[in-house]
A protein has these predicted regions:
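Hydrophobic, aromatic-enriched alpha-helical segments typical of multi-pass transmembrane helices
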Residues: 3-33, 39, 43, 47-198, ...
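Short, Lys/Arg-enriched, Gly/Pro-containing loop segments at transmembrane-helix junctions
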Residues: 211-213
């Protein structure tokens, strides 16, 4: 347990960088893969030439997120047990729902939304994203209580940026509006993740800074 706490910041940094960069790295080996229009999960479909690498990479990053949560809980526990439970729990849920399950559940490119595997993946991924958004929300609130205006603003911008980008990503499925966003669907998904991962990275750096004291 002590080892997991010690390496928690490293696990979290590797999880964030690994999960965010994986689509760009594997996309180079997928002929015709367009980062602007295609969503990340398409790398794991049965027709993808990098399916195995994507699934294995998702399992690794998901495991790293989960392992990092032990140190995250310990870091916030001294301030608030409730805060520690929610933040660490959100990271665990994200690692499991959006990463591990992505790597374990194989989805056909022809599967409909009501296909059990597709629905399970979509449901857990959505829940995981919402859970992860509680991280900047709570950290912004915590910073505001301490009158740390710049820190509070940073987390608030991350939350609002992620929500706005996620809305534009999901709006693809809406009539009329969807056709206008078809050429930027992949961009909005990645931008939402970018804003979502910044607070997680900040936690890792805060842990490292705390250890140097």
């Amino acid at each position: 347990m002590r080892i997991l706490k010690k390496f928690s910041p490293l696990f979290l940094i590797l999880a964030v960088i690994g999960d965010f960069s994986l689509p760009y790295y594997l996309g180079r080996s997928y002929p015709g893969f367009d980062q602007m229009t295609m969503i990340i999960s398409q790398l794991g479909e049965s027709t993808s030439p990098v399916q195995t690498y994507f699934n294995n990479g998702s399992i690794i990053t998901g495991s790293l997120f989960i392992l990092s949560s032990i140190g995250v809980y310990s870091f916030f526990q001294s301030e608030s047990k409730g805060l520690a439970q929610i933040v660490a729990g959100a990271i665990v849920l994200y690692g499991f729902g959006d990463c591990l399950l992505t790597g374990l559940i194989k989805i056909s490119d022809t599967a409909s939304f009501f296909n059990p595997a597709y629905f399970l993946h979509a449901a857990f991924s959505g829940i995981a994203m919402v859970a992860m958004m509680f991280v900047p929300l709570l950290l912004a609130y915590q910073a505001s209580l301490k009158r740390q205006k710049v820190v509070s603003l940073f987390y608030a911008v991350c939350l609002l940026g992620s929500l706005l980008a996620l809305f534009l990503f999901v709006a693809y499925y809406l009539p009329i509006i969807g056709s206008l966003l078809s050429s930027t669907r992949g961009f909005w998904q990645r931008l939402s993740l970018f804003f979502l991962y910044l607070p997680a990275l900040s936690i890792a750096f805060r842990q490292l800074a705390h250890k140097k004291r």
